[in-house]
A protein has these predicted regions:
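Intrinsically disordered, low-complexity, mixed-charge
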Residues: 1-91
């Protein structure tokens, strides 16, 4: 089991990034949450099998069509309580 907290910055708001990451996570069986943070960041907590979390992390660098990811900071975290990734309100 692996859990990562991600801070993804760049053009990641207003381009469907949160909905895209929810779909990616569900495809790989990864739980947790995702939300907008500030004006140019998305924050996510991913929890699941090591390979599944790594696959979603690798995909995050690509993002949806109009996203332009400038950086991803990933840190180890406590596991998420949510077995299915869900979208939280922005902070």
């Amino acid at each position: 089991m692996k859990s990562l907290r991600l801070i993804i910055s760049g053009r990641v708001q207003g381009v469907g990034y949160r909905d895209w990451i929810v779909a990616e996570a569900r495809e790989h069986g990864v739980g947790g949450w995702v939300r907008n943070r500030g004006t140019d960041e998305v924050e996510a907590l991913l929890s699941g099998d090591d390979e599944a979390v790594d696959a979603v992390l690798a995909a995050c660098d690509r993002g949806p069509l109009y996203a332009r990811v400038a950086s991803i900071v990933a840190t180890a975290s406590e596991p998420a309580d949510e077995p299915i990734l869900r979208r939280l309100p922005s902070v």
